[in-house]
Amino acid sequence: MFSNTFAGLYKKWLVYLYNSADVIITPTPYSKSLLESYDLNKEIYAISNGVDVAQFNPTSKQINEFTQQFHISEEDKLVISVGWLFERKGFDTFVEVAREMPHVKFMWFGDVRLSNPTSKIKKLLKELPKNLILPGYVSGDIIKGAYGRADVFFFPSREETEGIVVLEALASHQHVVLRDIPVYHGWVDSSCAELAHDVSG
């Protein structure tokens, strides 16, 4: 009951905040449609955050730095993902797929929110398959090298307002596999990514 009451108060506060603006800018038509459901009295525009594609054109030097740091051989098949380690991002699905493919290396770049990890995430972190590496938060040349070296960027998130890491992976010319969720409709299709309808969870 408390959580329902809090959610109602939070929504009222959001509506007040949004209506205090002159205009509202949100990154995708999907997130725009969510805001429109709040019955706001302001103009709402969908404008992507975008990424600087020149920054996501991995060089051989960046790829070599990444492979050397994490001991990735030329023969290794590598699947990566990037984001906070929690269920909404699909971390549990990523772990499950890694467990089912022991011959492939999996890496998830990102930190767990230690202040409030769910019991499910705590359990997953204690029982990780041996082929799954969690480097934590990584930036700069190393993450760019990861985007360049990986065979697949697998991002099974259940909900996004855009998905900046998806833009980064696409800019890096990665083979992208996504859970088919509404936010991607209209700008991601089979020409640039695999949209999975049968991802468990």
Where are these regions (language model features)?
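Short hydrophobic beta-strand element within catalytic cores of glycosyltransferases
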Residues: 175-178
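Carbohydrate-associated surface elements
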Residues: 30, 50
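Glycosyltransferase donor-sugar binding loop
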Residues: 51, 82, 105-120, 134
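Aromatic "clamp/platform" in nucleotide-sugar-dependent glycosyltransferases that forms part
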Residues: 158
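Nucleotide-activated donor-binding/catalytic signature segment of Leloir-type glycosyltransferases, i.e.
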Residues: 118-141
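Short alpha-helical donor nucleotide-sugar binding micro-motif in glycosyltransferases
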Residues: 18, 137-138, 145-150
